[in-house]
Amino acid sequence: TLVRARTDLVVGGGCERGADAELLVRVVQEQLAAAGLHPSRIAGIASVTLKQDEPALAALCDALGGVPLRFFEADALAAIATPNPSQVVRAEIGTPSVSEAAALLGAGQGATLVLEKQKFGIGTVAVAQAPHPLRAFTAGQARGQVQLVGLGPGREDWRLAGTDAVLRGADHLVGYTYYTDQ
């Protein structure tokens, strides 16, 4: 059986620091099933930038087929009207909503919540539907990447193939100044 699904859903998530990844994955999968939302429709996961280093969110992306994980600043999330704001979250991180606001902001203008915030022991989850398929989920910020490249013994023509492209695309360089100043 061939199932073709629109990728028009964004899962917004918030969780405690060091949350149990297996529990987060299980709860999100259960919430999607209960709402009748097929996981293949998920274009990506969105959260607040404070969670960029949260392993449970990365595990959730992997469990949902390797969907992208994107982040929004707390002030951007605070500007989004949501049906279930939390004063506790506002006091902690500066926005009254993480899961609902991140889902809506990630799904783009005209998005609607198809699953309002669901609270569970270690966090919250919400799902927004975009008004159109999200062919590439590029809203917000991606997690940073670290790339290790060899600069060789110094001469430009001795560098490994692709090294210059990585260096040109880098926001920050860390290395021995004799090489990085070239």
Descriptions of predicted regions:
Residues 75-80, 121, 180-182:
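Short gly/pro/ser/thr-enriched loop/turn and capping motifs at secondary-structure boundaries
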Residues 1-51, 128-129, 175-180:
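Conserved mixed alpha/beta catalytic, RNA-binding, or beta-rich assembly cores of soluble enzyme
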Residues 69-73, 112-117, 175-176:
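General beta-strand structural signal in soluble alpha/beta enzymes
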Residues 34-37, 139-182:
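Glycine-rich, flexible N-terminal cofactor/catalytic loop recognition
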Residues 48-50, 57-98:
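Long, charge-dense
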Residues 5-9, 42, 108-111, 121-122, ...:
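Short coil/turn connectors at secondary-structure junctions
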Residues 12-14, 114-117, 128, 148-150:
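Short beta-strand segments
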Residues 1-4, 100-135:
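C-terminal edge-of-domain segments
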